[in-house]
Every structure is written in C-alpha cells, then in structure tokens.
From Swiss-Prot:
Keywords: 4Fe-4S, Acetylation, ATP-binding, Cell projection, Cilium, Cilium biogenesis/degradation, Cytoplasm, Cytoskeleton, Iron, Iron-sulfur, Metal-binding, Nucleotide-binding, Nucleus. It comes from the Eukaryota. ATP binds at G22, K23, G24, G25, V26, G27, K28, S29. The modification N-acetylmethionine is found at M1. GO terms for cellular component: centriole; centrosome; cilium; cytosol; nucleus. This is Cytosolic Fe-S cluster assembly factor NUBP2. It is found in: Nucleus; Cytoplasm, Cytoskeleton, Microtubule organizing center, Centrosome; Cytoplasm; Cytoplasm, Cytoskeleton, Cilium axoneme. Heterotetramer of 2 NUBP1 and 2 NUBP2 chains. Interacts with KIFC1. Interacts with NUBP1. The gene is NUBP2. It comes from Bos taurus. Binds 4 [4Fe-4S] clusters per heterotetramer. Contains two stable clusters in the N-termini of NUBP1 and two labile, bridging clusters between subunits of the NUBP1-NUBP2 heterotetramer. PANTHER family: CYTOSOLIC FE-S CLUSTER ASSEMBLY FACTOR NUBP2, NUCLEOTIDE-BINDING PROTEIN NBP35 YEAST -RELATED.
Length: 271
C-alpha cells in the first residue's frame, strides 16, 4: 500500500487542475491564463505552475517577465502578478537569464525540476492551482502526474482545436489520462471560428465541432468553444487582463462559462 505524502507546500491548496493538450499551438497556455483570470474575478485565489519547460509563455502573458523568485523559509516564493496577490505564478521562465534562452536539458533534469516545483514552491492558501503542462505526452507528464498524485488533483482540462489532426492528438491525451488514472474534468475547443466584429457572423476558419464530437464519443464533458478573438490576442501580447478589459468581446462569454463550470465542480472556495 502506497504511503500518504506529506502535504508540505501544497497543504493550503484546495483544488489542483492540470491543463493538457495533445499538440502544441492549440492555445493551452492561453486557456490556463484566462481561466486563472476568470477564477480571480470570481473571488478565488489562484496559482499557476508553468511546467512547460521548453516554452514558458505565461510570464509574458501576465506581464511578469523579468521578475525574480526568491527563497523563503518554506521554499521558493512565487511571483504575484496583481496588487491584490490573488494570482501567483511559478515558471522556469523566471530562472532563465534571458527570456528567449533555450532550455536544453535531458529528461532526468527536467523531471527533477518538475518534482522540485511541486514540492518546493510556497503557495500558501489557494483555491485553485492550475498546472500548465507541455504539449503531448512524455516523461515530463508522467513526472507531473506522479508528483501530484498524492495530493489528489481534481483532474485534467484538455484543450484542442477543431482540426482533425488536433482532435486525433487529443484522443491520445485522453487515453493517457485513463491509463494514469487522471480524471478528465472536460474538453475545451479553442480557435473555433471567427466572429466578425461588425456583423457578429461566425466563420469557421477551421473545421467545425471536432472537439464537441470527440467529447461525446469519449464520454467526457464538453466545457465550451472559444472563438478566435483579436482582442484576446492583443490582451495576451500586452499583458492585459482580458476578463476585466474586454467584457464585450466574442471570447469573453465562452471563457467565463468554462470558469463557471470548473467552479461548479468544486465546493465553495476560500473566504
């Protein structure tokens, strides 16, 4: 029988959600960032653990590039990205000398850092910890799941786009979740059509409905479709709070709905 893990620095974290994608370029880190912002505006304290070691993009999305982490009494202190200290972030991007520096590490070194991130970051009290993972399935994913398993993560949020090739990759991601015993909270389809800002007509730039159909066939919840949205892209490039600044944009209701569905999965958060 496996021994229970010491809660350590995750003792104050109520719910852990992994964000996965079958391939790169589907907007996984975008969904992680916007979900964190939406949860924050719902009154929750949120942490983001960016373990996409070779592509740590979240510091830029949250305008936190160049910030430094430091060692506290209980471990690494994450970077707070807002004045209220309601969103904290830990990323390998904070450990690089230059933002565009390549991480050229072999598997064992990556896995060791992932385990250190899980055990040694002093998160304090959080309602949600979102874990932004690399694309695909690899040793790094196994390291993340193994390190978090003793802490009973809520499950995985899987991100795809409508194209058949992306949907095929997500099938493998869902198989991975089943094999490692990781519950799938739901599937999100990103980049699902472009809504004209003038007439509000939606044009399906890629194929249509692949994510929803896959969710139905796989027997997992479909949490929603997020359209292509220039204002969302602009907010990420500028490090702005999309949920606060663009409530009338096409992507806003979709992202808010996904956050509400995550909230409905869990009991009331911290006061």
């Amino acid at each position: 029988m496996e021994a229970a893990a010491e809660p350590g620095n995750l003792a104050g974290v109520r719910h852990i959600v992994l964000v996965l994608s079958g391939k790169g370029g589907v907007g996984k880190s975008t969904i992680s960032t916007e979900l964190a912002l939406a949860l924050r505006h719902a009154g929750k304290k949120v942490g983001i653990l960016d373990v996409d070691l070779c592509g740590p993009s979240i510091p830029r999305m949250l305008r936190a590039q160049g910030r430094a982490v430091h060692q506290g009494d209980s471990g690494w202190v994450p970077v707070f990205v807002d004045r209220e200290q309601s969103i904290s972030l830990m990323s390998v991007g904070f450990l690089l000398e230059q933002p565009d520096e390549a991480v050229v590490w072999r598997g064992p070194k990556k896995n060791a850092l992932i385990k250190q991130f899980v055990s040694d970051v002093a998160w304090g009290q959080l309602d949600y910890l979102l874990v932004d993972t690399p694309p695909g399935t690899s040793d790094e994913h196994m390291a993340v799941v193994d390190a978090l398993r003793p802490h009973s993560p809520l499950g995985a949020l899987v991100v795809t786009t409508p194209q058949a090739v992306s949907v095929g990759d997500v099938r493998r991601e869902l198989t991975f979740c089943r094999k490692v015993g990781l519950r799938v909270i739901g599937l999100v389809e990103n980049m699902s059509g472009f809504v004209c800002p003038h007439c509000s007509e939606c044009t399906n730039v890629f194929s249509k409905g692949g994510g929803e159909e896959l969710a139905r066939h796989a027997g997992v919840p479909f949490l929603g479709s997020v359209p292509l949205d220039p204002e969302l892209t602009r907010s990420l490039e500028d490090g702005r709070d999309f949920i606060q600044d663009f409530p009338d944009s096409p992507a806003f209701p979709a992202l808010s709905s996904i956050a509400q569905k995550i909230l409905s999965e869990t009991p009331a958060g911290l006061s």
